[in-house]
Every structure is written in C-alpha cells, then in structure tokens.
Amino acid sequence: NVIAGSKAIAVKQAPAPDDKQARMRQAIANAMARSKREIPHYYLRHGIDLTSAWQWLADTNAKRPVTERLLYGVLLVKAVALALREAPEFNAWFVDGRTSARSGIHVGVAIALRGGGLVAPALLDADKQSVDQLMRNFQDLVQRARAGSLRSSEYSEPTITITSLGDRGVDTVYGIIFPPQVAMVGFGAPRLQACVVNNAITARQIIDCSLSADHRVSDGHRGALFLRAIDRLLQAPEKL
C-alpha cells in the first residue's frame, strides 16, 4: 500500500508464483467434491493379460527409429476408444438430470503438470485415429499441456477420461469421475505374474484395468462387459 493524504490506496501486486497452482488445486478440489457428492460411483477391476500386446510392441518398435516408437499407453487408449463403440453408455455426459449420449469418442488423458496439478485434455475422435496418430497427438498434447497452450475444445470435449499411475509403480487406480462425464478408466503398472495357461504355469505381463462409473447411467453388468471388450481388443494389438 501507499499513503496518499489520509487514505490508503491498495496497489495491485503481481500474483505470487504459486497462485496459479493454488487456483488449479482449488478447481480440482471443487470438481472432485462435486463428483463424490452428486455421482453414485461404482467400481470394477479386471486383470488384463498384456503379453501379446507387449511382444507386438517390442517387435514393432525394434523395426523403427527411436523417434517413431510407440508407448504401450497408446494401445490402451485405442482399445478403450474402440470398446466404447460397443458400450456407448459410457461415452456420455449426465447433465440436468438426464443422460446425453455423445456422438464423438473424445478420450481425455490425465496429465500431471510439473509444477503440480492435473489436466485431462481430449484426444479427439480417438477411435478413428491409428496408433501412430494417437502417439503423435498424445506427445503434442502433453507438451502443450505443460506449456499452458491447450485449446478450449481439448478441455471441454472429453467424453470419458483415462488415468494411469503405472509409471509410479501403482498396481491399481480407482479414479473419481470428471463431471459431466459418466465414467473413468484407470490403468496400473504392468507386472509379471504367474498364470496358468494351457495347464502350465507361466509368467505373463498383467495390467489392472479399473472402471469408475456412474450408477445413474449404467450398472455393473454393462461395466463388466466394457472391461471385457477392452481386454479382448488388447489381445489383437495389430488390429488396433
């Protein structure tokens, strides 16, 4: 403040460096509190054998320069997007007490920001993109998210969100739905696990896939079929 005569005049100060982060945390808190207060969540988990996808990815990347290699995450995104064609009730919004089906499949991907906080912009029409297109667009999305240059449509258009904490070693993640969406899919870290295949014990690459869904829109039976569809699609990675 400066003093002019007998009156104190407030001088506008530059925002503190952490103001933006604090505002983001408050926005996240408000959205998540609203979600847990208003949305009757239910949760499902399904272990998916990624061994075939893992081998296909290794073989594919071995033939490519480093700059063109794929991450396994794009296979997960594509499988979820295609599974939504079979389970469209999870590709919807719930607005003003009614379910609103969405025509496009716009998969939001949760991205942690370096300074703290989280955004979940959309890969638009993810079901129509090749895995190579998804890889390029995902890398671009991450770069622009961390640079603060996302487009408004990328914030507002997600019809479902995928979250993954696999790179942090978490086995299973159960997400909180972003309103007005009606579902979130979570992936943990792939891990070697002893499994019985053809009556023999063998090591397989397993990943936990979870579903958080809105019970006003779907039920556990349909949720289970959705997770099974994701599993089935990942068994044929060359067709994604």
Model-based region annotation:
Residues N1-L240:
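C-terminal catalytic/motor cores of large multi-domain enzyme assemblies
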